[in-house]
UniProtKB/Swiss-Prot annotation:
The lineage of its organism: Eukaryota, Fungi, Dikarya, Ascomycota, Saccharomycotina. It comes from Saccharomyces cerevisiae (strain ATCC 204508 / S288c). Sorting receptor involved in the transport of vacuolar enzymes from the Golgi complex to the vacuole. Involved in the delivery and maturation of PEP4 (vacuolar proteinase A) and PRB1 (vacuolar proteinase B). This is Mannose 6-phosphate receptor-like protein 1. One of its GO terms (cellular component) is endosome membrane. The modification Phosphoserine is found at S335, S339, S342, S371, S380.
C-alpha cells in the first residue's frame, strides 16, 4: 500500500511539474520556430489589412523594437529628435552636459574617405543651411570631395530598426535608403547602421565609420546604452507566473504530498500495533522493515555488492597466505637440503608422524615393564 501511494504521489508531482519546467525552458514563447511563425503571420496579416485598426500589441513602434524571442524592449528613439515617452522601468539617461543630452545629429570622421559624415538616428540631421540642397527626409549626408559646396545624401532616415540573426536575433540594424545616385548611374546610395549595447559609454551614442562598398553603400557602428534591452511587461508577467508556479509546486509537495503520505504511514502503523496487541505472533516484523523494504532492483544490487565484498575478502586472505608462505614461517626440516615443494613437505610430515608413533609405543612399553617389576619381587619373597 505504501509503495502504491508513493507512486501515485510522484506521478501527480511530475504531471504538475513537467509543463511548468517546459514553459520555463522555452521562455516567453513555445519555441524559436513558433515565434518566427507568429511574427511572419503577423506581418502577412498587417499587409493584408492595412486599414484595420491595430491593437496595443500590434502597434508600430517608433524607432523601437521588441525581441520576439526574449520579449525584451529596445528603444532607440532617445537618440532621435522626437523621443518616445519612457515606459515603466526605464530611466532617463543623459550625457555629461545639456548639449550632449539634447544632441540629435552626429559628425563622424570618415577615416580613409577624406570627408566627414553627418548622421541622425530615426530623424533628419538637415538644418536650415543644408535644407536648400537636401530634403528633410535625409538621414545622413557628407560633403562632396570634389566640390565642397555640394552635399551628397547617403539615404533617407528610417524609424523601423530590425533585429537580424534568425532565431537568436542578436544584431540590431537600421537601414537608410533612397539617397543620391551612385557612381554607376543605376543605384542610389544607402546606409546601414549596426547598433551595439554599451553600458560603459559616457555619452548618448558613439558612431564610428566602418567602410563603404563601391562608393554606394556605407556602414557605421553605433555604440550606445540605448541599444541595450530593457524588461518588458510581458516578460515581467511571465516571471511572476513562473514564481507562482514554483510556489504552488512547493505547496503541493509540502502540505498535500508529504503530510498525506505521513498520515497514511501513521494509519498503517497504528493498524499494525492493534494487530500486535491482539496476536504478537502476527506482527513480528519491525516497523522500520516495512518502511525500508526495498524493491527487487535494490535487493538485486545489494546482493551483487555483498558478493563482491565476499570475493574481495577471500582474495585478500589468499594473498596474505601466499605472502606468509613466501616469507617463510616456522618449519621442521629433516635435513638442510630438504626441498620446499609440497610433495617433500608431505613426506616430511609423514616421517614425523611415524616417528611420533614409534615414540608413543616406546613410552607404552616402558610403562608396562615398570609395572611388572613388583610382581617379580613378591614371588621371590
Amino acid at each position: 500500500m505504501l509503495k502504491r501511494s508513493s507512486l501515485i504521489y510522484l506521478s501527480c508531482v511530475l504531471i504538475i511539474t513537467i509543463p511548468i519546467l517546459l514553459h520555463v525552458y522555452n521562455g516567453p514563447g513555445l519555441s524559436h520556430e513558433a515565434n518566427e511563425h507568429r511574427a511572419s503571420h503577423k506581418q502577412k496579416r498587417t499587409l493584408a489589412n492595412p486599414d484595420k485598426p491595430k491593437s496595443e500589441n500590434d502597434e508600430d513602434l517608433f524607432c523601437a523594437v521588441t525581441n520576439p524571442v526574449t520579449g525584451s524592449y529596445i528603444d532607440l528613439s532617445q537618440l532621435s529628435s522626437t523621443p518616445n515617452k519612457l515606459r515603466e522601468g526605464q530611466k532617463q539617461i543623459s550625457g555629461n552636459n545639456k548639449h550632449e543630452s539634447s544632441k540629435t545629429k552626429w559628425s563622424v570622421r570618415g577615416w580613409g574617405y577624406d570627408t566627414n559624415f553627418t548622421l541622425g538616428i530615426c530623424s533628419s540631421p538637415v538644418g536650415e543651411a543644408e535644407s536648400q540642397q537636401l530634403s528633410n527626409l535625409t538621414g545622413a549626408f557628407y560633403v562632396d570631395q570634389l566640390n565642397e559646396n555640394n552635399l551628397v545624401s547617403i539615404g533617407d532616415f528610417s524609424t523601423r530598426p530590425a533585429l537580424v540573426g534568425g532565431s537568436t536575433a542578436k544584431k540590431l540594424t537600421l537601414k537608410y535608403e533612397n539617397g543620391s545616385m551612385c557612381p554607376n548611374g543605376k543605384d542610389k546610395k544607402a546606409t546601414l547602421l549596426n547598433f551595439v549595447c554599451d553600458k560603459e559609454i559616457q555619452s548618448k551614442a558613439q558612431i564610428s565609420y566602418i567602410g563603404n562598398l563601391h562608393n554606394c553603400s556605407y556602414f557605421f557602428e553605433v555604440r550606445s546604452i540605448h541599444a541595450c534591452p530593457t524588461s518588458n511587461k510581458k516578460n515581467e508577467v511571465n516571471v511572476l507566473g513562473i514564481f507562482i508556479g514554483i510556489f504552488a509546486i512547493f505547496f503541493l509537495v509540502e502540505f498535500a504530498g508529504r503530510r498525506w503520505i505521513y498520515a497514511k504511514l501513521n494509519r498503517h502503523l497504528k493498524n499494525d500495533d492493534e494487530l500486535h496487541d491482539i496476536s504478537p505472533s502476527l506482527n513480528e516484523q519491525p516497523h522500520w522493515d516495512l518502511i525500508e523494504d526495498g524493491s527487487r532492483w535494490s535487493k538485486f544490487f545489494n546482493g551483487i555488492i555483498k558478493t563482491t565484498r565476499r570475493f574481495t575478502k577471500s582474495l585478500m586472505r589468499s594473498l596474505v597466505r601466499g605472502r606468509n608462505s613466501r616469507q617463510g614461517g616456522i618449519r621442521l626440516r629433516s635435513s638442510p637440503s630438504a626441498s620446499s615443494s609440497s610433495l617433500a613437505n608431505r613426506e616430511f610430515f609423514r616421517d614425523m608422524e611415524a616417528q611420533n608413533e614409534i615414540i608413543d609405543s616406546l613410552d607404552i612399553n616402558s610403562h608396562t615393564t615398570e609395572s611388572d617389576h613388583p610382581t617379580l619381587a613378591d614371588n621371590s619373597v
